[in-house]
Each structure stands twice: as C-alpha cells, then as structure tokens.
Regions:
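Phosphate-end processing signature that detects enzymes handling 5′-triphosphorylated RNA
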Residues: 2-147
Length: 147
C-alpha cells in the first residue's frame, strides 16, 4: 500500500537509502528501466493497483543508456529510504527530486492480502493513496506532481 507522508521520521540518515532514477519505455504494458545506485534493472509489470506481478531483469549500464533513448516519459528521480516498522515490515520512503520536488510517499509491501488489509499505518504515514492513480510513478512521470 502507498501513502503520503505526514511527517518525516527522525534520524532519517541512520536508515539505508538508494538514489533512484527511472522512466518508462511503455506505460501499457508497464515496462520500466531503473538505475538504483550502480544497479540497472528492466521491469515488466502486470495489471493491478495493490497486488501486481513483476518480472525483473538485471541489465548493464550500456543497455540502460540505450534503453534510456527509447523512453516515452520523463525520468523520475528520488531518494528511497528503507525504514523498519512493526510486524517485521519495511516502509520505503521516497523523497522526490526535480519537477516532483516536495512530494514524499511511503510504500509497504506485504506477504499476503490479509496482512495488507489489516495493516495499521504508523503515525508518520499520511493519507492512503494506494488507489489514487495520480500517484503511480507512471502518472508522475507523465503528468508531474498532483495538485
């Protein structure tokens, strides 16, 4: 599930983080390229808002650069922090940059649908935007920050 952020957690710099840039070669079906620090990944995603199947393939820097010339969206740039939360889960806090500056989202992935639906978010989480298509990374890369 995906949420806006009501308050940035304290001591953010103590958590592991990655610098991510990503763009979409296609939005239907979803085909994404991503650079996360020094890793390069091509992802193909299935349909669905909360539960989606993904196929990931590691690619090299040269392949990433070649595929970058084929994208149909702008690049999304963000810093992702991995923050442990209750229940042995991790919250992925994304702080967006460039044309999305000021946008913060947090996402939690669950082992099953029952745990997903019974999840009680920590106080620092804001509004649940899991079903709001404007906050999908594909929409952000096409249309920018929602009003």
């Amino acid at each position: 599930r995906k949420f806006l952020v009501a308050e940035i957690p304290e001591n953010l710099d103590q958590y592991p983080h990655n610098e991510i840039e990503q763009a979409y070669i296609s939005t239907s079906p979803t085909i994404r390229i991503r650079k996360s620090d020094s890793d390069y990944i091509l992802t193909i995603k299935g349909k669905g808002a909360v539960a989606r199947e993904e196929f990931e393939l590691s690619i090299n820097e040269e392949q990433y650069k070649n595929l970058s010339e084929k994208v149909e969206t702008r690049f999304v740039s963000k810093t992702r922090y991995i923050i442990p939360i209750d229940g042995g889960l991790n919250a992925e806090l994304d702080i967006y940059h460039l044309y999305l500056d000021g946008l913060l989202t947090v996402e939690v992935e669950f082992p099953d649908m029952a745990e997903c639906m019974s999840f009680v978010p920590p106080k620092w989480f804001g509004k649940d935007i899991s079903d709001d298509k404007r906050y999908k990374n594909t929409a952000l890369s096409l249309f920018g920050k929602p009003e």
